[in-house]
Amino acid sequence: YDYITIEDDSQSSDQDWKAKIAADFAVGNEPDVIQYFTDANASDVLAANKLVSIEEIKKSYPNYAGDTLDSALIAAANPDGVERAVPTTGYWEGLFCNKDLFDQYGLELPTDWDKMETAIKTFKENGIIPIAVSLNNVPHYWIEFLMLSAAGPEDYAIVPKTAPEDWCKGLAMFKTLRDMGAFPVDTDTIDNDFAGELFKNKQAAMQLDGSWYAGGVPDQENTVVTAFPVIPGGKAPAGSMVGGISSGFYITKKAWDDPDKRDAAAKFVMAHTNKDAVTTYWGGNGQAAAKVDPLDDMTPLGISGLNYSSAATCISAPTDSRLSQEAYNILVAGIVDVSTGARTPEDLLNEVLQVNAK
């Protein structure tokens, strides 16, 4: 395409830039290809109805988005459920395990709830904290995975008016786990950094955290990431993951409907979203949206995180992506009381949802 010039107008994605993009789409000045948000941040651009769906593009280019994981395409779908953007990278949350502690006590990794309960009991009996967490500071990851596990991805993603039974069932596991002795005795007073040190120093066996946590773990050889085990009676499929993919490459109708630009636009996006390109964008950090190979310099923990995220059966966004900040703060602040039995999950969730509906 020696007759085509690519103009790169990349900028920081701040509010001013988002306003400029929305204005460009509104007045017919949109680009041919854009890497942009896929979530509610894209609402103004989506309202202009100037982006082509992947389904439409695949009719002419069957290999379009061909290297992209199905779970990543679904996660990058717009709020209306239509897949238009081809993502490159994202982040994941998962269960970090000190595998050497599991091996020391002859335990299997907690790939199902029976193994989780066995591990908690055995570690507690041997003076190892089963789960590093600060319930008063950052119970976020446990909120997400327990509710997702109980409700399944579809019901986890809704924003109801009153507390759903499955959400309550998920949060009730905080008390179950606390009663088992799964958490540090001072989980109500320590902060998240202290909880993280318990895991890193091998005083605790497990910790739920995000892909950003992996690089700070000192023992990259004996630490692994596993899928969160489904709680008893939970509706989530095994391998369900909390994570996020919030941007991707779009083709606009302006380029798609132009015979001189359609082929170039499609091949440009394919060049930036194939396995090799995604490997470059990803660089070993977070989640790769395509099935990539481990980098030569990746640690065993890095490879474990890659394998875990690539095998995810579904990717669900965190709870705070659907609730107002005020409502979410109330949810987080109420977890200690739920874990001690001082407050029921139903009572807490009804307050959260009532505030969220304001």
Predicted regions and their residues:
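C-terminal capping/gating helix-and-loop segments adjacent to ligand/active sites or protein-protein/ligand interfaces
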Residues: N78, G284-A290, S304-A357
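Glycine-centered hinge/linker elements that transmit conformational signals in sensory
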Residues: I120-F123, V159-D188
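Extracytoplasmic/periplasmic solute-binding protein
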Residues: A75-T88, E93, E117-P160, A204
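Extracytoplasmic/periplasmic substrate-recognition and gating elements
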Residues: Y105, M180, D219-G284
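A structural signal for short loop-to-beta-strand junctions that line the ligand-binding cleft
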Residues: A23-D24, P31-D32, N63-D100, I129-P130, ...
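Short, solvent-exposed loop/beta-turn-alpha elements that line the ligand-binding surface or hinge
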Residues: E55-L69, E108, A150-L171, V230-M241, ...
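Hinge/lid segment of periplasmic solute-binding proteins
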Residues: F37-E93, E108, E117, W142-F145, ...
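Conserved N-terminal structural module of periplasmic/extracytoplasmic solute-binding proteins
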Residues: Y1-A48, K59-A65, P232-P237, D347, ...
